Regions:
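N-terminal capping segment at the start of a domain
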Residues: 41-70, 82-90, 222-231, 293-300
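A non-catalytic alpha/beta surface segment that caps or lines the substrate-entry region
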Residues: 61-127
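Alpha-helical metal-binding/catalytic segments enriched in His/Glu/Asp
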Residues: 126, 138-139, 149-202, 317
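Metal-dependent peptidase/peptidase-like ectodomains
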Residues: 196-286, 306
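His/Asp/Glu-rich mid-to-C-terminal helical/loop segments that flank catalytic regions of hydrolases
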Residues: 293-339
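PDZ/PDZ-like groove recognition
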Residues: 336-380
């Protein structure tokens, strides 16, 4: 197989795919020579970022892997070369540790005790400091499924690299493009850019950042997330989630749209990293071009993406940010959860579990409006320890307990609130 070497600020990256012709000039321009005059840094396109991240050499960017570290270092160098300041806990990096924990969703659970941890993920965090009062967070997860493992929809024999071009090299590349375009512009806000890891295992990186922020989250204006924005179709359908999380969003989306068939979703809860910020009472917008047959399969490759569409999405998001730049701090508004997964059971409490919780029970990270949990009086932070006669020790036992009930039945759910047990009557 043809091998290519990419050098960025003296870091060497090995590229394996024979389709990587776009990087010949890229590597030559970014090679840093040890001489008095530094070689100018070439601007990297959305396509070039995708082709790097989705190359076979990155082996699917699985959280905790050596190639995840390589991808993280690449992104850190990209931020550095654009002149963004580091805002992690270790330069541009924010490590977090966790141990895998099997449950019906194939997620993992964060473990705050490092001595018991088995895996370390890396968020990559960079900052544009405009000396403004508020900060806009712009994020996209860069991890994927590695060679498949849990979460893969591939049914072939043997392990194959899942490159995750759309999911989510596309979102990261658009985020990088926005970082370049926002440098020195729209200075009424600061901008924090985060490449999350651990999304595929249960929003681990974003959840960790929200609970261990490197900026004052009370000064966060709003958060924009991009996950799978690389497959814009001919009808230009673009889904935007979280539109109801601030009164300003709907009109702003409409006023700046001339190209897209917008599919607006009110809810701030969904299967991507914006959820972590919404649950911390921050307005969020999440952009998504839709599902496709290559989702979570080895066939999600870079050559299948719509790069003109990604450029257009980047411009649209920039226009939205520009429009909101003079509006000050946006108001936050809670929404109904429109995106609950259809479970294998007939009833659900209507809560968002805290997948990072590693103690006894199931801790609630969010409560959906007008659902059984809210009607019964449950709140964020409650720990469910018993459902009817069934003891809840972890996520698995919680899921199993739900299969024992029918819609319309009533039962007592015991929760711990600030260490005090409470018995609440739930109507399913």
């Amino acid at each position: 197989m043809l091998i290519k070497i990419l050098v960025i600020s003296n870091n060497i990256y090995i590229l394996k795919k024979s389709t990587m012709k776009v990087f010949y000039l890229f590597a030559a321009v970014l090679l840093v020579f040890s001489c008095k005059t530094e070689t100018p840094v070439k601007e990297i396109s959305i396509k070039e970022d995708v082709y790097f991240l989705a190359d076979d050499s990155q082996e699917g960017r699985e959280t905790g892997s050596e190639t995840e570290k390589q991808s993280a270092n690449y992104l850190a160098e990209r931020f550095k070369n654009m002149g963004l300041a580091p805002k992690g806990t270790d330069g541009y990096l924010q490590p977090f540790t966790f141990k895998p924990k099997t449950n019906p969703h194939g997620k993992a659970t964060y473990n705050i005790n490092k001595e018991d941890s088995t895996i370390t993920g890396l968020n990559v965090v960079a900052y544009i400091d405009n000396k403004a009062e508020n900060t806009v967070i712009i994020g996209a997860h860069y991890d994927h499924l590695g060679f498949g493992n849990e979460g893969s929809l591939y049914r072939g024999e043997g392990a194959e690299i899942h490159n995750g071009a759309d999911d989510n090299a596309s979102g990261v590349a658009v985020m990088m493009n926005l970082a370049k375009r926002l440098k020195g512009k729209n200075t009424n806000n600061n901008y924090l850019f985060i490449s999350f890891s651990g999304e595929e295992m249960g929003l681990l990186g974003s959840n960790y950042f929200v609970k261990n922020p490197t900026i004052d989250t009370k000064k966060v204006n709003y958060m924009i997330n991009m996950d799978m924005v690389g497959r814009l179709k001919d009808d230009k359908s673009l889904a935007v989630y979280g539109v109801g999380t601030s009164p300003k969003f709907s009109q702003t989306l409409f006023a700046n749209n001339s190209d897209f068939k917008l599919i607006e979703k009110e809810s701030g809860v969904g299967p991507s990293d914006h959820t972590s910020f919404y649950l911390a009472d921050m307005p969020v917008l999440h952009f998504f071009t839709g599902q496709h047959e290559d989702y979570h399969k080895p066939s999600d490759d870079a050559e299948k993406l719509n790069y003109e569409g990604m450029d257009a999405i980047s411009t649209y998001i920039l226009d939205i940010i520009t429009d909101l730049d003079n509006d000050g701090r946006l108001a936050f508004r809670k929404t109904k959860n429109e995106s609950e997964e259809t479970p294998d059971f007939k009833v659900t409490l209507g809560v968002v579990p805290d997948y990072l919780y590693d103690d006894k029970g199931m801790r609630i990270d969010g409560v959906s409006e007008e659902r059984p949990a809210q009607r019964a009086g449950m709140i964020k932070g409650d720990v469910v320890i018993k459902v009817g006669e069934y003891e809840i020790t972890d996520m698995m036992s919680y899921m199993k307990s739900l299969s024992k009930f029918e819609k319309g039945q009533k039962t007592i759910v015991i929760v711990e609130r600030n260490g005090v047990p409470l018995a609440l009557e739930v109507t399913w």
